[in-house]
Amino acid sequence: MTRKIIAVIPASGVGSRMQAGLPKQYLKLQNKTILEHTLEIFLAHPDIEKIVVAVAETDPFYPQVALLDSPKIQIVFGGETRAHSVFNALQVIEDDSWVLVHDAARPCLKRSDLDKLLQIDDKQGAILATPAIDTMKRADGNKIMRTEDRSTLWHALTPQFFPTRLLKQALISAFKKNLTVTDEASAMEFSGYQPRLIAGRSDNLKITRPEDLALAEFYLTQNTEKKI
């Protein structure tokens, strides 16, 4: 049976580390907002039925994003944290579907990585990730406590892909226990699941600091040139 796949884009953050005058998802790269670049990836995929975008209720910028008028996109209001925004989005998604959660500020996702993730049919779900290649230090403040074994460490990326019903239940359980949910996989882990790691590309960066903009623009330019 063909699965119903829905994408969720939490886009209600303020992006304080960007030191910009507006939330980072509305900053522009190549004459489009970061959010538009991100949405285009999912709008172009034939297996994704709908995209639910969670925005802040007081956000004055999202009505100016023309792409959000697409009939394939539904807007919901986010919550106090990213996890609550994702949970709010799940309320308008059928429980028997699968959900792809992707950061609004990751505009450089490659279709090949997305396709690899969508091939997974394991109820424990899966996430894109990259193996740690730098030496990893555990710190106490700004002092090194020890060096960690990087051979077992991965950088979690998005999208993260789960059965909607199970992710919803995992988030509810985490909220009740006041657990800190940093990504969807962490909520699933708290509920005893072991999501799979799917090796993704390192250029699927999350724009977080001002210097990330130039790098993202470079990656997007490379993508454009390859299509010509």
Curated annotation (Swiss-Prot):
The record marks R17, K24 as: Transition state stabilizer. It holds the Pfam family IspD. It catalyses: 2-C-methyl-D-erythritol 4-phosphate + CTP + H(+) = 4-CDP-2-C-methyl-D-erythritol + diphosphate. Pathway: Isoprenoid biosynthesis; isopentenyl diphosphate biosynthesis via DXP pathway; isopentenyl diphosphate from 1-deoxy-D-xylulose 5-phosphate: step 2/6. The record marks R150, K206 as: Positions MEP for the nucleophilic attack. GO terms for biological process: isopentenyl diphosphate biosynthetic process, methylerythritol 4-phosphate pathway. Keywords: Isoprene biosynthesis, Nucleotidyltransferase, Transferase. Its EC number is 2.7.7.60. GO terms for molecular function: 2-C-methyl-D-erythritol 4-phosphate cytidylyltransferase activity. The keyword Nucleotidyltransferase applies. NCBIfam families: ispD (TIGR00453). Catalyzes the formation of 4-diphosphocytidyl-2-C-methyl-D-erythritol from CTP and 2-C-methyl-D-erythritol 4-phosphate (MEP). Belongs to the IspD/TarI cytidylyltransferase family. IspD subfamily. This is 2-C-methyl-D-erythritol 4-phosphate cytidylyltransferase. The gene is ispD.
